[in-house]
């Protein structure tokens, strides 16, 4: 075989793009390449069971919040469906998740065992797509599950990131 699944799905930087699955060039920085926030990138082939999105960054020194969303396209008018929106809110120490289908936001979920983000510190968020749900890991620890509210996983083809953070890696 030509390598394991992990080797084939591992993020690779080629021609300034990450694994050709997220289509936004890396901002050139001699010592530490950073991705520009707000960020919007294409997920090649959309989501499917077994696919993982990796977001690594550093929380700003005095953050209010930051968000990571997986959406069905980039449309603003009408707004694209949001399969999952993750929002870290530092004032309330909450990691909120929700979705928006056909312009209607669902029931917000906010219970977490602990708040994993620290100002001015690096973090690693992994969004693992499984058949019935997204499984969210922060710094290697499973934090919660979010059950799909959008049926066609392959339509989830865009990642958007904004707020008080610096991105260091996407894959």
UniProtKB/Swiss-Prot annotation:
CDD domains: GLECT
Keywords of this entry: Lectin
Keyword Mitochondrion applies: no
Annotated PROSITE patterns: GALECTIN
Pfam families (alphabetical): Gal-bind_lectin (PF00337)
Domain Galectin positions: 38-170
Signal peptide as annotated in the record: none
Transmembrane segments: none
Gene3D superfamilies the UniProt entry points to: 2.60.120.200
GO cellular component, as recorded: cytoplasm
GO MF, any single term: carbohydrate binding
InterPro entries: ConA-like_dom_sf, Galectin-like, Galectin_CRD
Function: Does not bind lactose, and may not bind carbohydrates.
Protein name: Galectin-related protein
Organism ancestry: Eukaryota, Metazoa, Chordata, Craniata, Vertebrata
């Amino acid at each position: 075989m030509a390598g394991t699944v992990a080797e084939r799905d591992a993020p690779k930087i080629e021609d300034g793009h990450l694994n050709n699955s997220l289509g936004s060039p890396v901002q050139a920085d001699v010592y530490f390449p950073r991705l520009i926030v707000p960020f919007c990138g294409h997920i090649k082939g959309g989501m499917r069971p077994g696919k993982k999105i990796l977001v690594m960054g550093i929380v700003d020194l005095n953050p209010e919040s930051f968000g990571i969303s997986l959406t069905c396209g980039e449309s603003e008018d009408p707004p694209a469906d949001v399969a999952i929106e993750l929002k870290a809110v530092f004032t309330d120490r909450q990691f909120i998740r929700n979705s928006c289908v056909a312009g209607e936001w669902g029931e917000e979920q906010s219970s977490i065992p602990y708040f994993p983000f620290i100002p001015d510190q690096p973090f690693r968020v992994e969004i693992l797509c499984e058949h019935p749900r997204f499984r969210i890991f922060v710094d290697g620890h499973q934090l919660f599950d979010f059950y799909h509210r959008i049926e066609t996983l392959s339509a989830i083809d865009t990642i958007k990131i904004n707020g008080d953070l610096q991105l260091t890696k996407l894959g």
